[in-house]
């Protein structure tokens, strides 16, 4: 009788452990911070990229406010990466690579899960024009603006001359 009770108790305990195992996510997945999840996404970007060099996190936009925290829920992310001097084939982690002077900068957006399972992300990265191009564009606009203002001044002087008579 005692053996039956012990066996029944052991069976019930096993059932509870089994149910608990189904409810709690497996140990192969990890609960990551927002930053860690983004760093993993950058690693995956580098693995899937056909670019010659590795990219490294340049700037991490703040995480959006979430009402309810569900570890498995997809979280929107936004960050910027920059090309490094390390070739993509290097075993060195991107965090140990220096940024390439005038390297490409990419703005990345997408979703990741904080409860990380390998490859569970959806990120798109697009080139951002380098600061040099923006500077040249700004300077061209200023020069064009100055030319327009100079022509408007000349037209104004001609109109004054017409009314003077």
Swiss-Prot record:
It is found in: Secreted. GO terms for cellular component: extracellular space. Residues 30-130 form a propeptide. Keywords: Amidation, Antibiotic, Antimicrobial, Disulfide bond, Secreted, Signal. It comes from the Eukaryota. Expressed in bone marrow myeloid cells, spleen and testis. Its main location: secreted. One of its GO terms (biological process) is antimicrobial humoral immune response mediated by antimicrobial peptide. The modification Arginine amide is found at residue 164. One of its GO terms (molecular function) is lipopolysaccharide binding. Disulfide bonds join 86-97, 108-125. InterPro entries: Cathelicidin-like, Cathelicidin_CS, Cathlecidin_C, Cystatin_sf. SUPFAM superfamilies: Cystatin/monellin. Residues 1-29 form the signal peptide. PANTHER family: CATHELICIDIN (PTHR10206), CATHELICIDIN ANTIMICROBIAL PEPTIDE (PTHR10206:SF2). Belongs to the cathelicidin family. Exerts a potent antimicrobial activity. This is Cathelicidin-7. The lineage of its organism: Eukaryota, Metazoa, Chordata, Craniata, Vertebrata.
């Amino acid at each position: 009788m005692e053996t039956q009770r012990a066996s029944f108790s052991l069976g019930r305990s096993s059932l509870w452990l089994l149910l608990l195992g189904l409810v709690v996510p497996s140990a192969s997945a990890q609960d990551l911070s927002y930053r860690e999840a983004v760093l993993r996404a950058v690693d995956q970007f580098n693995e899937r990229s056909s670019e010659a060099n590795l990219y490294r996190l340049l700037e991490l936009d703040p995480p959006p406010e979430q009402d309810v925290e569900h570890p498995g829920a997809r979280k929107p992310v936004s960050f910027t990466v920059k090309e490094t001097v390390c070739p993509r084939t290097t075993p060195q982690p991107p965090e140990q690579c220096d940024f390439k002077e005038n390297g490409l900068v990419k703005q990345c957006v997408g979703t990741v899960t904080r409860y990380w399972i390998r490859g569970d992300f959806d990120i798109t990265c697009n080139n951002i024009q380098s600061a040099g191009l923006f500077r040249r564009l700004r300077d061209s606009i200023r020069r064009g603006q100055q030319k327009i203002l100079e022509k408007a001044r000349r037209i104004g002087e001609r109109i004054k001359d017409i009314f003077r008579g």
